[in-house]
Amino acid sequence: MDNAEIQQWLEQLRTEHRDLDEVIHHLVDARHHDQMRIQRLKKRKLKLKDMIARLESELIPDLDA
């Protein structure tokens, strides 16, 4: 993958991460919320965060001195 593809993929992942954050907050604030669904969404959000960090590290050039 080249840098442009990584940047595009990162933007999609960040958007999904933000969207999940909003959904989770909405569900937590709801009077009757499904704890199992919230846990699944939080797990997905954490996976997205890990994927974002991995892709961001690919954009940083190796500086072997």
Show where each model-derived region lies:
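Extended, charge-rich alpha-helical interface modules
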Residues: 1-65
